[in-house]
Amino acid sequence: MATATIALQVNGQQGGGSEPAAAAVVAAGDKWKPPQGTDSIKMENGQSTAAKLGLPPLTPEQQEALQKAKKYAMEQSIKSVLVKQTIAHQQQQLTNLQMAAVTMGFGDPLSPLQSMAAQRQRALAIMCRVYVGSIYYELGEDTIRQAFAPFGPIKSIDMSWDSVTMKHKGFAFVEYEVPEAAQLALEQMNSVMLGGRNIKVGRPSNIGQAQPIIDQLAEEARAFNRIYVASVHQDLSDDDIKSVFEAFGKIKSCTLARDPTTGKHKGYGFIEYEKAQSSQDAVSSMNLFDLGGQYLRVGKAVTPPMPLLTPATPGGLPPAAAVAAAAATAKITAQEAVAGAAVLGTLGTPGLVSPALTLAQPLGTLPQAVMAAQAPGVITGVTPARPPIPVTIPSVGVVNPILASPPTLGLLEPKKEREEEELFPESERPEMLSEQEHMSISGSSARHMVMQKLLRKQESTVMVLRNMVDPKDIDDDLEGEVTEECGKFGAVNRVIIYQEKQGEEEDAEIIVKIFVEFSIASETHKAIQALNGRWFAGRKVVAEVYDQERFDNSDLSA
């Protein structure tokens, strides 16, 4: 019987000679089979080959990038689907209301009461929205949210994006949970400088169709001496707020809106006085009052206290959207749990990071540079002045919950108690929050008592140097010079050189601020004492403490 020899190519090499090759001799009439353990690949000419064309394995970096891409794609897909479903749901509701307002072929028209309720609900939805224009192109949604959040909880921010330039078009719509928040934002944010520009805040263009209903709601609200209070500290209770505002008159009710899931208040509420003058005095005196490190936002209520007028909550999402969001969130959470376990095991492997969800930053890694977006103010330099602190060394009594183990915490507690005993004699130790929560306060001293209850703010470790250099004097050596000079007073975490333009004009003055972050507050005070009033290059330097909360929130404009 005739035989035939079949030479196979493996990894691009022709069999034969000294190169490794696979060959098989089979009878002419027999069916050839690949060796055991190999895969057969069908070629274009119909022939089979036993060679397995394997791709090179992915490197750890490539695997990590692939996981990031998958996670980011999932998040964007979920966000897109939810937005589309929400818009479709709202449009459907509006269509149903419009169709129900007229006589339909197979049904009855809405009753006058139902029609009025639908119109009011529509008016409330419009009252909750504000238009924000003249937004600097480098500012993103996070900056807008941070600027407008003090007035009340934000439901959504809609920024219009240019698909060609991939930048927003300079305007946005901010939707709050309650109309009073939008009204306060309209009154207090118009013409405020944000990112070097005076933003424009107004009502959406479609408010005209609902203006009669809005005027009617405002007229009904005047019958109640209610005020709206926002930016309330999370540690304050209804009774605390009531005791503060009782100084202006007798209060009929004081209620903070609460999250039904967590039971915590949402940072805003309503207070109703017995007299109209009391509400006017409270608004004029307490608006922008610093209570526990947060500036209260206080204004007149623009809607009557009727449960039927409560705006729709996010719980009105379509069931399909809610299910999709829950399933996707669970999947992402599971991925993060796996990534977190990997971080615990290696203490050096970066976790999966996405624009929306990030793992906790390991202790010992210097914080990211403060990229404040107050453009055209520009950060020209951020210099870490020392290497990262090893993970095994706790810094200033701060313990990262991801890396800390129970024995370590147990060892740190006695040390913390000893430090408190050394800092405060028994007669001078500050009262704890739990010891003060049952105190009774009222009248004009209530505000100070509540502030004392909340006064647990961390001392600032940031120093700002003003009037030190001109913009033209900034060079590559300035950061190093500042770091070296300030290093005489303590360990410098970082140095930020920030240029801030004082207007929108092209020739507007630019001032330079230099921010120096130390490891502890005592080093900051030592540096300020030494540098304040010192002359540098013919200029008298002004050294001051900078607010830690502003610095942590990337706000370098103060």
Curated annotation (Swiss-Prot):
Residues found modified as N6-acetyllysine: K250, K453
Cross-link (Glycyl lysine isopeptide (Lys-Gly) (interchain with G-Cter in SUMO2)): K42, K79, K457
Pfam families documented for this protein: RRM_1
Keyword match RNA-binding: yes
Region Disordered, annotated ranges: 415-436
InterPro entries reported in the protein's UniProt record: Nucleotide-bd_a/b_plait_sf, PUF60-like, PUF60_regulator, PUF60_RRM1, PUF60_RRM2, PUF60_RRM3, RBD_domain_sf, RRM_dom
Modified residues (Phosphoserine): S111, S243
Biased composition regions of type Basic and acidic residues, renumbered to the chain: 426-436
Annotated ranges, domain RRM: 128-206, 225-303, 461-548
Residue segments, region Inhibits transcriptional repression, interaction with ERCC3 and apoptosis induction: 76-558
Principal location: nucleus
CDD domains from the UniProt entry: RRM1_PUF60 (cd12370), RRM2_PUF60 (cd12371), RRM3_UHM_PUF60 (cd12648)
Phosphothreonine, modified sites: T59, T313
Keyword Repeat among UniProt keywords: yes
Entry keyword set: Acetylation, Apoptosis, DNA-binding, Isopeptide bond, mRNA processing, mRNA splicing, Nucleus, Phosphoprotein, Repeat, Repressor, Ribonucleoprotein, RNA-binding, Transcription, Transcription regulation, Ubl conjugation
Inhibits homodimerization, as annotated region: 1-515
GO annotations of cellular component type: catalytic step 2 spliceosome; precatalytic spliceosome
GO biological process: alternative mRNA splicing, via spliceosome; apoptotic process; mRNA splice site recognition; regulation of alternative mRNA splicing, via spliceosome
NCBIfam families: half-pint
Family statement: Belongs to the RRM half pint family.
Main function: DNA- and RNA-binding protein, involved in several nuclear processes such as pre-mRNA splicing, apoptosis and transcription regulation. In association with FUBP1 regulates MYC transcription at the P2 promoter through the core-TFIIH basal transcription factor. Acts as a transcriptional repressor through the core-TFIIH basal transcription factor. Represses FUBP1-induced transcriptional activation but not basal transcription. Decreases ERCC3 helicase activity. Is also involved in pre-mRNA splicing.
PANTHER family with a match to the protein in the record: POLY(U)-BINDING-SPLICING FACTOR PUF60, POLY(U)-BINDING-SPLICING FACTOR PUF60-B-RELATED
Protein name: Poly(U)-binding-splicing factor PUF60
Organism: Pongo abelii (Sumatran orangutan)
Source taxonomy: Eukaryota, Metazoa, Chordata, Craniata, Vertebrata
